[in-house]
Design a protein with these regions (language model features):
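PP2C/PPM-type serine/threonine phosphatase catalytic domain
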Residues: 4-277
Length: 277
């Protein structure tokens, strides 16, 4: 949403140099903060409880700007070597930082139920969050304390502005950027991930750059998803990253960890060379 809002004027032939500069300077932490604030406003009107981890990366020139809330991870791989790995953001083992809609207190649960019972309508398709109808006037006294975006002083919330990990990394053409959820890193060790990347690239001739750009990222993401799923589903697996971390915390755990798995892969391309991704 931040990118869309900041760059929408670029489609206008009357766009200014200021608009171009603002788009180029877009910060992923600010992007996550603005998106989260919008979600908070919309969720309070809907009475929705929930939370999510998030990792955002923006490529500007030769600089990759990264912001992370939680246990997603970004790899930057160059010439077959892992040169950067973003750090997970955790409160404690298996308790990542998250972007929450509301805190899980009795008051917020009661509020969400009340909002659901007193809504005058559902969110219309394509509506903007600031245009959504509020709850009935009969509920206004009860919810006035919640009718704002929470600040960092509100203890139950993690916020991108104050809590996100953020990095700026220089990239080169043909670098591989790999972004994945904890479902991958809880089930595959970094060495196993790198072995998979090497194996996929080994099937492409060094002279066939176009084919590598076109197919390698998809093959890598699909294969990693399948491997992570196989660890989850195989009762014979004797060790996984999640098991190792659990054991280090004094917990008994064997095998992989069931979870959803999301893997995105992309190759950095020179601006003058068309990139199929």
């Amino acid at each position: 949403m931040c990118i869309r809002d900041r760059c929408q004027s670029l489609d206008d032939p009357q766009g200014t140099d200021d608009s171009l500069s603002e788009c180029f300077m877009c910060n992923p932490v600010d992007m996550l903060q603005r998106a989260w604030e919008r979600c908070v406003r919309a969720s309070k009107r809907e009475g929705i409880l929930g939370s999510s981890t998030a990792l955002a990366a923006i490529l500007r020139g030769d600089e990759l700007r990264i912001a992370n809330m939680g246990d997603c991870v970004l790899f930057l791989i160059r010439d077959g070597k892992l040169i950067f790995r973003s750090a997970e953001q955790q409160h404690s083992f298996n308790y990542p930082l998250q972007l929450g809609m509301m805190d899980a207190t009795v008051e917020s649960v009661m509020l969400s139920r009340a909002l659901c019972m007193h809504r005058s309508g559902r969110i219309p398709a394509g509506a903007h969050d600031m245009d959504l109808p509020d709850v009935n006037d009969s509920m206004s006294d009860y919810i006035h304390m919640y009718d704002r975006v929470p600040s960092h002083d509100d203890v139950p919330y993690d916020t991108p502005q104050h809590d996100a990990g953020h990095w700026e990394v220089k990239v080169l053409p043909d670098d591989l950027v790999l972004v994945a959820s904890d479902g991958l890193f809880d089930n595959l060790f970094d060495d196993e991930i790198m072995d998979t990347v090497h194996d996929v690239f080994s099937h492409f001739a060094s002279s066939d750059l176009e084919a590598m750009q076109m197919y390698a990222p998809t093959l890598i993401s699909e294969r990693l998803c399948r491997l992570a799923r196989s660890v989850m589903d195989d009762p014979r697996v004797m060790c996984s990253p999640f098991q190792q971390h659990a054991n280090e915390e004094g917990m008994y755990y064997v095998g992989g960890k069931s979870d959803d798995v999301t893997v995105l892969a992309g190759l950095i391309a020179e601006q003058q060379r068309p990139c199929p991704l």
